[in-house]
Amino acid sequence: MANEFRVCDDCQATNIKTLLPRLKEADPDAKVEVGCQSYCGPGRKKSFAFVNNRPLSAPTEDELIEKVKKKIKK
């Protein structure tokens, strides 16, 4: 089963232009959905993504990508 990433294009702490390419680099075959994830509170302060329906957040995008890499199915 392929991995799935869901990210918000409206949250202040998430830079979609840099995050999407890095997620695709982590798993080129993953399904990616972009849109509101109703995660506005944490999304205001931390970079976040849903990975296989699990929310992951971190103070920086670099830290988030490290968490994502640990959670994706190989």
UniProtKB/Swiss-Prot annotation:
InterPro entries: DUF1450, UPF0741. Pfam families: DUF1450. Belongs to the UPF0741 family. HAMAP family: UPF0741. This is UPF0741 protein RBAM_034720. It comes from Bacillus velezensis (strain DSM 23117 / BGSC 10A6 / LMG 26770 / FZB42).
